[in-house]
Structures are given as structure tokens and as C-alpha cells.
């Protein structure tokens, strides 16, 4: 089970980054806003089951989960179950289980939280949470929005430029430095949760997650 402090300290990261820094599982990450998969030792990503509030969220076609699309800001509790220890939770997890869950707001009245992160290449991450709670009802709305032109400079070694003298003779060559023009991305996630406590020990919940 992940330490709650570690989860709070990494709210600006995806769950792929949280697993990389705080667990022994193998995370294959192709960069920001690209595919990130998780595999337990000796197995493939399709052997890793992922649940959110008890519901399996593996891709039904590929059998794996892209953890870059899961903001850690949306997760209140996370734990890992290795190998056959995951059978009690869900079947089909030969490698193991990544168990994710959210929790209702534990305070009464309205609450508002806003966090912004700024990175290189004009990268912006914005996090917003609006909560409300009373004796019977709890509501939570979380929004994550990330954007970046991702226009870093690189040396294009597929494009060689020649250097000419006054007589148009080639006297040298070089690889030009260009700026990436096709790496821009915008990513938005919305999580809406509504809970109702009957006051008799039962609680009903309705959760909706837009990826």
C-alpha cells in the first residue's frame, strides 16, 4: 500500500510516475502524454489487472492499462498485490493487481482547491477540486488540465546541410538544429463523485470519470 504522504507529494504526476518512484514494478514509459504500461516481475502488461473502486479498467481489446491517462490527483488510495495474492480481488491477474480507489470528502460545507504547475517548454498543469459535504450528501468534482507546445530544440540528423564557398564548392556540412513542431498536446480529465449516507450504515455512490 502506498504511503498517503507520497500520494499527496506527487499530485502533479501521473500514476505511471508514482509507480516508478515508489514501487518495484516495471514501468515502460514512452514520455509525457504517451503510452505508459506496468508489468510485474516476469510478466507482461496484459497480465497486470487494474481496478478503480473495485471495477476493472483494463482496456478490453488490449488487456492492459495506460497509466499516463490516470492522474494521481484523482487517486486517494493505491496498493499493489503481487502474483496470486490478487486472486481474492479479481481474476486474470497472473502478474498482479494495481488497486486504485477514491474516497468521499470527509468535511462538511464547501471546499475548493487549486494547484498549478509550470514546466519547461511552456508546459502548464492545472488541478481543481470542488467539494461539498453534509450529514447525508458528499460531492466531489476534480478537474485536471495539461497542455504544452512541447517545442524543444533538437539536432536533425536526417537532414544534412552543405556549406559552400564563393565558387559553389562544397567545403563542409552540418546537421541543422530545428524545433519540434509536432509534439504539442492538450489533456483534460474530469472526475465526478456523489455519495449518499442513509444514516443506517449504508452508503450509495455514483462516480463518473472522463478521460
Where in this protein do the model-derived segments appear?
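N-terminal periplasmic "start-of-domain" segments of outer-membrane beta-barrel proteins
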Residues: 1-8, 37, 45-48, 78
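Transmembrane beta-barrel architecture of outer-membrane proteins
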Residues: 10, 14, 35, 65, ...
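Extracytoplasmic beta-strand/coil segments of soluble accessory domains associated
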Residues: 16-59
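A short, compositionally biased micro-patch
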Residues: 20, 33, 41-43, 73, ...
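Short beta-strands and strand-coil junctions in structured, solvent-facing domains, enriched
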Residues: 47, 57-58, 84-88, 148
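Short acidic/polar hinge/loop motifs at secondary-structure boundaries
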Residues: 55-82
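Short strand-turn segments of transmembrane beta-barrel domains in outer membranes
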Residues: 77-79, 87, 97, 102-132, ...
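Periplasmic-side early beta-strands and strand-to-turn transitions of outer-membrane beta-barrels
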Residues: 107, 132-211
